[in-house]
Amino acid sequence: MIDSKQKIAVLGAGSWGTALAALVARHDYPTILWGRDVRVIQSIDIQHQNFRYLPSIMLPQTLRATTDLAAAVSGADWILVAVPSYAFTETLCRLAPLLSIGVGVAWATKGFEPGSGRFLHEVAREILGGDVPLAVVTGPSFAKEVTLGLPTAVTVHGEDVCFTQMVANAMHGPMFRAYTGNDVIGAELGGAMKNVLAVAIGVADGMQLGMNARAGLITRGLNEMLRLSAVIGARPETLMGLAGLGDLVLTCTGDLSRNRRLGFALGRGQSLSDAIREIGQVIESVQTSDEVMRQAEQNGVELPISEAVRAVLREEITPYAGMKALLAREQKPEYLDILFKANCSL
């Protein structure tokens, strides 16, 4: 039974924040959505539509929206942050002095902190302190499909079991499954890397390289996820689940994926600036490719697909040159090490 006093504040009125706010509002949780754009907030609060990011989709009439951050978080039982990665640090800095004791913070932001390459849970812990319950929401989920009520499955990872379950319970419903776990690093890694890898698949599709190439890039991209996860302390099963493989497949094959659309445009010969302008929304891979490679270089892990994507997004090489370089790599064993080690205690 839902606690009638429980209130959820969602920070970020883009497509994903709006979708998640609408989801929990439909599950009868008192929900308020915060955003910066006055016109967007007014359209949500008055017309019950996000005219900019989710046009023509009706939102629950019980969903409230505001541009006042203090008003949004006042009395909230927990907070869900759904802003782009470049705004994550600033948003938490503004939130910290407004946060009441015992209020947990979850986020559906994917990526790393731009510039430092830090995982977002590291940023959150530093800004919010050690006593605030934290959790990350991730998995294969297009905002439009969630808002339309189409079947979706995500996973919520956090060290605080009670808070993690609270977040999952609010989201879980007839058309939305929310699983739980405690591998925050793995969950964040999958959500960040899939955006970079989706650009490579988009490029291949734009160049009309065929379904074989797409399948090969997705599989070898998953291998890159697993190899990096092995050296940073993430669990391979997390990357083989919704947070990794699930999100990777959706982002690499779905036409709603902005990162795939960016790669597709580049593969068709469009310039980076024109492609970004045409898509018209934040494309996480543009910054995340730098941070993924920063993690790889710091840990001595070779990520050829991610490295090629970074070079293309920096406009150091053409998409054609990037694909040619990947195909010209020397022959080698498919696996250089055991990715999954048997647990004899099971």
Swiss-Prot record:
Signal peptide: none annotated. The keyword Cytoplasm applies. One of its GO terms (biological process) is glycerol-3-phosphate catabolic process. The active site is at K194 (proton acceptor). Pfam families: NAD_Gly3P_dh_C, NAD_Gly3P_dh_N. It catalyses: sn-glycerol 3-phosphate + NAD(+) = dihydroxyacetone phosphate + NADH + H(+); sn-glycerol 3-phosphate + NADP(+) = dihydroxyacetone phosphate + NADPH + H(+). This is Glycerol-3-phosphate dehydrogenase [NAD(P)+]. It comes from Xylella fastidiosa (strain M12). The gene is gpsA.
